[in-house]
């Protein structure tokens, strides 16, 4: 049982029942007198008594399941008083007092009742008091519009509550609005922490609210006294018995005889979830203009009344059916039509039997079933009644399927769960129209639904049956009615086209994973969506003997109650006439009567059927529509993960799948090479892993990522060219030897060309003059000026100083272009006879020294880096060593990346269905299609397209039945069919949207950690971002790529996105994607619908009245049958695809250049340099090809105490960088590193001291890892440090180019000044 606590109002309701008698009086026994006739009471009094009884039952049930608590605490011992001694007879005081009480009770006859405590329990009062202390009102326009509650570390209030706090600490707080809930949250000041309530998890049970108890049962919350709540109570908390808050109230609405609530529930970790009721009204105070009283009442004979409380003498459908039907017809558009319908169908004046169960759900279901008394069952044509066509009481009129699951909604002519008079009955009862035109009800009908196998009947309410059926080409409904087995079979192609799913499981799912799904609603609600129109009843043909009995001249007509009998009569010497009878029994006189064409018309309307001729167009009433589609949250299964083992560069998956599970893989590089496979039973799969990484996803489990470490050979892939050549020859010799052969061939060709050129020059005549042609070397030197230099936002001299400090090689290369320019200028000045000695003299060099000195006195330290834009990549780590300062550790990591495309919705599409106008039959006459086909009744209220209307002649010759056509060839029929959207199109998961994609914006968030300070920087693809942290200046961006996984055309359906070249708007074809198109946001009745589903109207057969047509099945379902792969499976670079909004997240592509200016204030100046010495390094263990697979121990002597940064100087061998504390004396540091080769030589720098660590590494146990490795690869993606030094020694020294240029220039000038002619032999 649920724990129960009482409030004051609950005790006041129970007080008269436990009122004690007067003291000292013995109540005599009185025999029970005859019950007097109780006065008639209205519905309001009955409803109030029912509410009190329901509250009393809940309270008694709570007391029955709750143990009695002894509230008597330990006695208080008074000071300075001696305890009383025991009496002389040796009895204890307690026993004596107990005995005395028993004697008093015995003397009074045992009829003395204990006076109850007329107040709630102590626990309840304490919990309510605690909740009030943490609740604060919100004022709007001087009145309380709602409340906010302090729970845990935050303050919560409903988002619809507007206003401000009248509290000094809470007046200026700023709330954050939740995206999917009616909730706002904010942080409150720390000084109010003592007033905050503790959270608790909301489960099934009974809780304490401001206005009584609140009961939760299967995520449905009811309140027995919510009628006392007023506008402005939104946001009030409700607590458990310990005073912990489990949720806040948003509003409520009537649900049967109780009030159902919409709440926000919490758990212990303050995770919120909204339990919403669609008809709940927010309990916030509306603006002043909306506070005017609004009277919504029904009308009858110009009199207004409360729709839920009409006078039963005038409205009861069993007593006055005509008045009741008139009242329903006059109030069809009233917002409270539901209340009126329930009132007129459940207003029996007879005394109701006392029911044991008063569940609100059961009561409401009973009212829904009883509401079918406003309509009558009917008989319609069935094409197959056990082999032959017939007019069946269970004829199948409509079969609806979403196409994505096995559940069918079937409409038949009979009514399930209804008695013959229209009252609520058992589940096996079936109300139907008999062959004689009378309404019957049969119990134990054994209702069966079949396709290729028997279906599971989920629920049957009224005309509708909900069944879970296997796929098939036909549908059969069978039932036993008064001992006769009836069945009806119709052609229906039941196919299940699943949208993209990862698991095909059946049954209950124990996981917590949920997703949006579409299903038929089984909980009727009071809204227009849950109502269906009924029209005038069509006549039912019966045999004349069932209604008329003749005895010679005297004939008696038997008219069933509530019906009209009509037939043709011809007497002797009299013309043929049609007579109508409406009373119960009438007689007439007729000589030699000839009676034909008898029919019975029900007095109550029924549903319109396409298997019957067209009837009246006026809506007479609306009855419950129990199973409309709705979007719900469905739990999905999660398949158990297999055992994962590594073998070389492969991943082995071994496990057992109890049901089909989808296994998808994709590479995390540019080419995704996506694969998908359905597995079931025992399986063993081998999946190769690449160095770029691979993503595995089994069913609905979280994706798994694996990377392959490169298999390294001997030699060094990050060394000098000859070592690099040895490494590649042993790693992949075929490519290495091919490269060597091509290089040798090119070298031989170049040597031959050079020899030929020298030979030609030797035997040629050369005449060189200095003017006007310049020497070749001068032109070649001038070409160096065309080399583009590096550009930056900093001054040029700052860049030169930074290069001089950090990279002498880059400094030399950067100075090559200015030196060439200086040589050219000097050369020009010299030949213009200008003196350049002053430029190259003492003053020039002095100016240069002053500039360099100024550059060295910079006030900030700049650190530049290029970070890969991949959230899965390891973070960048570095130790900043600056002379004279303690080292600082720098970490840069990519938090997330977002690719947001600019989209335009071209149209949406969904499943198209035909809408059929019941046939218009002209007996012995001709009919024609109307000029405006939208005026046809079946098309009104719907958006139609692809409308077809044909007139068929020579139909139904001499047909006996509902058409009553006795002509042979003059009969005509109008058949009209159009295309419209399915009722499932209003659900987001069943609708596909076609987007055109334009440009995309790329954003990334980078976390920069310097010491203990973290700074978040947002960078973009279209510019440079300048950000400031705590004294940091960061310049980042732009992102090096604008890559997007989305094509120019994409399709979004549910939670998946597809790259698909959809047809343009208005160009759809039957059976293809886009056969139904619309742009309007009104998904039920779009005003711009385009449809082409291939409708073709055919000539009807003459066996029954019907509309014959064909059409093509939905193009969207056919497209889904082709099983296209969504982007969540095929997107390159490991992008995560978000459908709504349309985004690509965490794509591992591109890079972000960054520059970090660190001010001097961030550095701590060294007072004493530790000066480590006597460094020794011992490699404890080493495993190459593994992230941080090596371990080393470094020992050294520290001269002074301080801090030193430890990092690796060997490119390609990363070390776990850190800042270590150095003490005077012996020091030991243990660190880890990653080795890319079997032999590793690592240079480690500690402050300014360097130590070498050398060791041989063992092969890795596995070449597959679950995290992206930190060490580099030998794929040639970077230029190694030794190669840069090797090239720098050739061209990097600035003295080399300067001296060589000056020497060559001098020689050229000398040679050019002396004109000489060399004559060679010809």
UniProtKB/Swiss-Prot annotation:
| Lipid addition sites, S-stearoyl cysteine | 1312
Regions of biased composition (Basic residues) lie at: 73-86
Q: Where is this region: Transient transmembrane before p62-6K protein processing?
A: 761-785
Where is the segment annotated Functions as an uncleaved signal peptide for the precursor of protein E3/E2? 284-303
Reproduce the UniProt comment on modification after translation: Structural polyprotein: Specific enzymatic cleavages in vivo yield mature proteins. Capsid protein is auto-cleaved during polyprotein translation, unmasking a signal peptide at the N-terminus of the precursor of E3/E2. The remaining polyprotein is then targeted to the host endoplasmic reticulum, where host signal peptidase cleaves it into pE2, 6K and E1 proteins. pE2 is further processed to mature E3 and E2 by host furin in trans-Golgi vesicle.
Q: Name one GO molecular function term.
A: structural molecule activity
**Lipid-substituted positions (S-palmitoyl cysteine):** 785-786
Residues annotated as region E1 fusion peptide loop?
955-972
Q: Where is the active site?
A: 160, 182, 234
Give the record's GO biological process terms: fusion of virus membrane with host endosome membrane; proteolysis; symbiont entry into host cell; symbiont-mediated suppression of host toll-like receptor signaling pathway; virion attachment to host cell
Q: Which residues lie on this side of the membrane: Cytoplasmic?
A: 757-792, 830-834, 1310-1322
Motif Nuclear export signal extends across 165-175
Location of region: Dimerization of the capsid protein: 203-213, 240-244
Q: Where is this region: Host transcription inhibition?
A: 48-81
Additional information? Structural polyprotein: Translated from a subgenomic RNA synthesized during togavirus replication.
Q: Name it.
A: Structural polyprotein
Q: What is the lineage of its organism?
A: Viruses, Riboviria, Orthornavirae, Kitrinoviricota, Alsuviricetes
């Amino acid at each position: 049982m649920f724990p129960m606590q009482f409030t004051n109002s609950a005790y006041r309701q129970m007080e008269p029942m436990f009122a004690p008698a007067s003291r000292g009086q013995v109540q005599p026994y009185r025999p029970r007198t005859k019950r007097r006739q109780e006065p008639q009471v209205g519905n309001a009094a009955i409803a109030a008594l029912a509410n009190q009884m329901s509250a009393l039952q809940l309270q008694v049930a709570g007391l029955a399941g709750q143990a009695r608590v002894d509230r008597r605490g330990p006695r208080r011992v008074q000071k300075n008083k001696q305890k009383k001694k025991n009496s002389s007879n040796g009895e204890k005081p307690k026993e004596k007092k107990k005995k005395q009480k028993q004697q008093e009770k015995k003397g009074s006859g045992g009829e003395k009742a204990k006076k109850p405590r007329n107040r709630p329990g102590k626990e309840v009062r304490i919990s309510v008091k605690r909740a009030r202390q943490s609740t604060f009102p919100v004022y709007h326009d001087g009145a309380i519009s709602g409340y906010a509650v302090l729970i845990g570390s935050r303050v919560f209030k409903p988002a619809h509550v507007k206003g401000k706090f009248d509290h000094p600490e809470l007046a200026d707080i700023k709330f954050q609005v939740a995206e999917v809930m009616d909730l706002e949250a904010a942080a409150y000041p720390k000084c109010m922490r003592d007033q905050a309530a503790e959270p608790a998890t909301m489960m099934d049970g009974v809780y304490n609210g401001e206005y009584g108890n609140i009961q939760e049962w299967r995520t449905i919350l009811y309140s027995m006294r919510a009628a006392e709540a007023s506008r402005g109570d939104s946001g009030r908390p409700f607590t458990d018995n310990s005073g912990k808050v489990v949720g806040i109230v948003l509003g409520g609405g009537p649900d049967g005889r109780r009030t159902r609530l919409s709440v926000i529930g919490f758990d212990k970790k303050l995770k919120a979830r909204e339990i919403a009721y669609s008809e709940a009204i927010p309990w916030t105070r509306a603006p002043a203009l909306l506070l005017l009283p609004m009277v919504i009442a029904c009308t009858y004979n110009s009199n207004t009344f409360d729709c839920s409380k009409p006078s039963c003498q005038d409205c009861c459908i069993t007593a006055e059916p005509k008045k009741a039907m008139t009242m329903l017809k006059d109030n069809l558009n009233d917002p409270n039509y539901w209340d009126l319908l329930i009132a007129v169908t459940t207003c029996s004046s007879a005394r109701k039997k006392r029911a044991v169960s008063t569940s609100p759900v059961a009561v409401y279901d009973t009212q829904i079933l009883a509401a079918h008394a406003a309509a009558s069952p009917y008989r319609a044509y069935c094409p197959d009644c056990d082999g032959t066509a017939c007019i069946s009481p269970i004829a199948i009129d409509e079969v609806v399927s979403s196409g994505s699951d096995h559940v069918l909604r079937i409409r038949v002519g009979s009514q399930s769960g209804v008695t013959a008079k229209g009252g609520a009955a058992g589940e096996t009862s079936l109300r139907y129209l008999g062959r004689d035109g009378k309404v019957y009800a049969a119990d134990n009908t054994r209702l069966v639904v079949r396709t290729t196998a028997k279906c599971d009947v989920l629920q049957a309410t009224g005309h509708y049956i909900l069944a879970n059926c296997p796929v098939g080409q036909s549908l059969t409904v069978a039932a036993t009615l008064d001992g006769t087995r009836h069945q009806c079979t119709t052609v229906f192609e039941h196919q299940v086209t699943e949208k993209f799913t990862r698991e095909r499981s059946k049954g209950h799912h124990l996981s917590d994973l949920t997703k949006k799904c579409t299903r038929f609603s089984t909980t009727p609600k009071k809204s227009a969506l849950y109502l269906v129109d009924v029209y005038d009843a069509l006549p039912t043909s019966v045999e004349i003997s069932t209604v008329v009995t003749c005895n010679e001249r005297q004939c008696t007509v038997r008219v069933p109650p509530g019906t009209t009998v009509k037939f043709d009569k011809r007497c002797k010497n009299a013309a043929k006439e049609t007579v109508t009878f409406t009373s119960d029994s009438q007689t007439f006189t007729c000589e030699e009567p000839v009676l034909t064409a008898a029919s019975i018309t029900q007095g109550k309307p029924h549903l319109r059927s396409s298997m019957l001729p067209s009837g009246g167009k006026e809506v007479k009433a609306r009855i419950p529509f129990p199973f409309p589609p709705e979007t719900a949250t469905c739990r999905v299964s999660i398949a158990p993960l297999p055992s994962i083992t590594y073998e070389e560069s492969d991943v082995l998956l071994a496990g057992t799948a109890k049901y089909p599970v989808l296994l998808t893989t994709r590479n995390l590089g540019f080419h995704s090479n996506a694969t998908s496979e359905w597995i079931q039973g025992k399986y063993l799969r081998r999946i190769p892993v690449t160095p770029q990484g691979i993503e595995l996803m089994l069913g609905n489990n979280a994706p798994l990522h694996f990377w392959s470490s490169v298999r390294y050979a001997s030699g060094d892939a990050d060394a000098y060219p000859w070592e690099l050549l040895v490494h590649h020859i042993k790693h992949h010799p075929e490519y290495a030897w091919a490269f060597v052969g091509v290089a040798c061939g090119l070298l031989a060709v170049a040597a031959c060309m050079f020899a030929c050129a020298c030979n030609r020059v030797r035997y040629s005549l050369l005449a060189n003059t200095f003017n006007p042609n310049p020497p070749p070397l001068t032109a070649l030197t001038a070409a160096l000026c065309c080399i583009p230099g590096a550009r930056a936002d900093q001054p040029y001299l700052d860049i030169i100083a930074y290069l001089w400090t950090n990279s002498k090689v880059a400094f030399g290369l950067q100075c090559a272009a200015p030196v060439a320019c200086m040589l050219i200028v000097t050369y020009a000045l010299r030949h213009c006879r200008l003196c350049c000695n002053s430029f190259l003299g003492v003053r020039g060099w002095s100016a240069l020294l002053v500039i360099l000195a100024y550059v060295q006195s910079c006030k900030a330290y700049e650190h530049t880096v290029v970070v890969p834009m991949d959230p899965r990549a390891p973070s960048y780590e570095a130790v900043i060593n600056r002379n004279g300062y303690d080292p600082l550790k720098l970490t840069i990591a990519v938090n997330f990346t977002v690719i947001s495309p600019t989209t335009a919705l071209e149209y949406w599409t969904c499943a198209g269905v035909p809408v059929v106008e019941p046939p218009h039959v002209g007996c012995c006459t001709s009919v024609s299609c109307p000029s405006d086909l939208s005026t046809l009744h079946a098309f009104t209220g719907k958006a139609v397209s692809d409308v077809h209307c044909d007139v068929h002649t020579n139909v139904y010759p001499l047909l006996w039945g509902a058409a009553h056509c006795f002509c042979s060839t003059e009969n005509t029929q109008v058949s009209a069919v159009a295309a419209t959207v399915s009722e499932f199109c209003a659900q987001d998961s069943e609708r596909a949207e076609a987007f055109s994609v334009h440009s995309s914006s790329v954003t990334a968030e980078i976390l920069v950690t310097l010491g203990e300070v973290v700074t978040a920087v947002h960078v973009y693809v279209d510019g440079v971002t300048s950000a400031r942290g705590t004294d940091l200046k960061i310049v980042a961006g732009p992102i090096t790529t604008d890559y997007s996984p989305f094509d120019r055309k994409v399709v979004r359906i549910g939670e998946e996105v597809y790259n698909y070249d959809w047809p343009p708007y208005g160009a759809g074809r039957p059976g293809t994607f886009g056969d139904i198109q619309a742009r309007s946001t009104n998904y039920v009745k779009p005003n711009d619908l385009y449809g082409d589903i291939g409708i073709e109207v055919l000539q009807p057969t003459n066996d029954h009245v019907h509309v014959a047509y064909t059409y093509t099945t939905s193009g969207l379902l056919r497209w889904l049958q082709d099983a296209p792969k969504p982007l969540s499976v095929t997107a390159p670079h490991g992008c995560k695809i978000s459908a709504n909004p349309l985004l690509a997240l965490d794509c591992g592509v591109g890079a972000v250049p960054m520059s970090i200016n660190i001010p001097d204030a961030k550095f701590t100046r060294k007072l004493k340099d530790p000066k480590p010495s006597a460094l020794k390094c011992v490699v404890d263990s080493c495993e190459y090809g593994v992230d941080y697979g090596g371990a080393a121990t470094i020992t050294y002597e520290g001269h002074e105490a301080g801090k030193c940064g430890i990092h690796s100087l060997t490119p390609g061998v990363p070390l776990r960088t850190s800042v270590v504390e150095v003490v005077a004396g012996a020091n030991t540091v243990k660190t880890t590193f990653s080795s890319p080769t079997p032999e590793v030589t690592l240079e480690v720098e500690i402050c300014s001291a360097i130590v070498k660590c050398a060791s041989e590494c063992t092969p890795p146990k596995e070449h597959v890892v679950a995290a992206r490795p930190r060490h580099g690869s030998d794929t040639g993606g970077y230029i190694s440090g030794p190669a840069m030094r090797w090239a720098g020694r050739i061209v990097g020294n600035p003295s080399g180019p300067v001296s060589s240029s000056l020497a060559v220039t001098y020689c050229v000038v000398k040679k050019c000044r002396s004109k000489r002619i060399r004559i060679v032999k010809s």
